[in-house]
Amino acid sequence: MSMSHLYGKDEDSDGVEMENFEITDWDLQNEFNPNRRKHFQTKEEATYGMWAEHDSDDERPSFGGKRSRDYSAPVNFISAGIRKPAAEEKSDSDSDSETQSRRENFPKDFEAKKLRTGGNFKPSQRTFAGGIKSNTDFGSWERHTKGIGQKLLQKMGYMPGRGLGKNAQGIIAPIEAKQRRGKGAVGAYGSERTKQSIKDFPVVDSEEEEEKDFQKEMSQWRKEPGGGKKKPKYSYKTVEELKAKGRVGKSLSAPQKEISQVKVIDMTGREQKVYYSYSQLAQKHNIPGEAPGQGVKEEKPQGFALPELEHNLQLLIDMTEQEIIQNDRQLQYEQDMVVNLTHELEKLSEVLEREDKAIENLSKVLETVEECERRIQPTCDNPLTLEECARIFEMLQDKYYEEYKMSEKADLSVAIVYPLMKDYFKDWNPLRDPNYGTDVMSKWKNLLEEGHLSHSAHDAAMDPYHRLLWEMWVPFLRNIIAQWQPRNCAPMADFLDSWVHLLPVWILDNILDQLIFPKLQKEVENWNPLTDTVPIHSWIHPWLPMMQSRLEPLFSPIRNKLSNALQKWHPSDSSAKLILQPWKEVFTPGSWEAFMVKNIVPKLGMCLSEFVINPHQQHMEVFHWVTDWEGMVALSSIVGLLEKHFFPKWLQVLCSWLSNNPNYEEITKWYLGWKSMFSDLVLAHPAIKDKFNEALDIMNRAVSSSVGAYMQPGARESIAYLTQTEKRKDFQYEAMQERRDAESIAQRGIGAAAAVPMNFKDLIQSKAEEHNIVFMPLIGKRHEGKQLYNFNRIVIYIDRGVVFVQGEKTWVPTSLQSLIDMAK
């Protein structure tokens, strides 16, 4: 664009040309004016440039006069101000009137159209430059032609109202022109796309992209196109990013002296570097963006570099970042502190509420206790009964359980319950009414018993219920037992059976060991089996289920007294068997057999030695005296007596009989008769079988040795038949016995398989049954939540397959076999 019309001289400028670079309305109007005056550069101007000489005709319009320019003056530019439009500069009224009269001579349609831009353009004026009018009659001349174009399109498949193309993708409406708002260049006023264009082609075209790039470049119009410094790119760091990054390690406070000043020479790079601390050496590989105060190394030297200012700015930035981080930490700390204090306040509020409730409950409990103390006074008109006191304790246990557990129940029961309990049992006779008071004591056991074990009366932490029994009930029982006669055992045994579930283990042991056993021991010492009409087992055996092994010290003196009584005994006296028979299951097998061998077997042997065998007139009383002891005396002892004192005489009588022409039929009957006198258990013994088989052999030899002599007809056959019959019976008996043994073994196997213990408790129970040991739970007795059991006299509990036995001060684990040995 030519700017020569802006050069001129002012009156005060001393001939210095001034050029204004501002874009005026004249520039905008004549930029797109095809009829503007063009200045063609001459040869001289091309050669000499601005120093070329110009003719007066070639002078460009300017605001200055026609005087010649002073080229010796320095070049200077002055502001031209706001230039008026070219149409307003024409002030020659003659030329205007001439031009107006000339235009009126032309038709209106052929009048030259002025290019309207900006505010002079109206949307209603839809005319093109050059006089062509755009209206609905455009192309109407085609109505008077043959319309060959429309026909050709229809032959090619065109359908009116649809677009062109295979898929009718062409536009239907004609291209719509959009008039620019102002007088600027194309795109100066934004996108010039019409609504139809946007609808048909919604994709942004390259012109719009170029428009965006142009607007971006226009914002940097002050920079030179190809040189200068590029636009700086600013990176912004939000507070959230700074918090997330948490640059904790950068301390921008006053630099502290390092613990050790060490000079470090770094020769790992291309150049030798010296550091004065290990921290500086550790920061040498830091990323430039991460290290404080270190800028990015510039490839080109900076023309305007202020390192001190940059350092200070970076220092301010780091200090601000650290302040933000510290403030965030402080805020987080305060928020956490608020949360903690809130929780603490809630907890303290709950504690305060619980304490208030506890104070209220304790006040009510105290009032109730004071009321009970007032009513137990002798001068009270409404005395407290034991039933009412039990209901009060139940109410305290139900409504104020925590306070009831925390209270000293022992002191409370001593002060209130003991006087009432003494008054309740003052007229009671346990031997007459053994069940009296059991329901009352059962209720008080549930109210006062705490569950921990008390082992003796000297235990400092004695259970209140145990203390109640020990201090009130046991002294009363001592007086009753002191007057009790052991031979009248039934009332006392029934009484203890009724109270055993209410008595603690240690109190029951104390009663049995300190009160009952001494009375029994003294009575056994005074017992005389020869003069006493009451059998001793009648007043000793009722205590066996309860005392069990506690009575073993009494068995030895009882056996001694019985032995002394049997010294002058004869087997013909059957009373001895009646006295001894109840003790067979009480004494141990070894002690019982030893007692029989010492006191009974010699007497029976003496009777058998005096026994006379006479086939013609046999007396069986002596033999029956011996066989009656078969269940009392061991089988081996009975067989020994028969082998020693009976069968030698019996075989001798048989031989004598066979040597005197006997009647074999009578001998056979005699043989079978004696054999029927023995039980199957005795006959099954091998020694007894051998003796009877020996008798058969003697009979067979006697028959076979009498060849040629006179013999009873059929005797040999009869003896042979008897022999075969006896052998067959023995074989059948042995087979039957083997079958019974096999069946019993199978039954034991099935029973054992069916009785396989499911847990350790079942195993202990099965072992107790095998060894005849009482194994039963102690009702209401627990230790650390585990049920306590009574294994004979031993108190045990089971924990995860291990048996714990109660010792003197603690619980001791033990094996099952050791437990069985201890119980025996």
From Swiss-Prot:
It holds the Pfam family G-patch. Residues 41-61, 85-114 have a biased composition (Basic and acidic residues). It is found in: Nucleus. Keywords: mRNA processing, mRNA splicing, Nucleus, Spliceosome. Its main location: nucleus. Residues 1-135 are annotated as: Disordered. Coiled coil: none annotated. GO terms for molecular function: nucleic acid binding. PANTHER family: TUFTELIN-INTERACTING PROTEIN 11, TUFTELIN-INTERACTING PROTEIN 11-RELATED. Identified in the spliceosome C complex. This is Tuftelin-interacting protein 11.
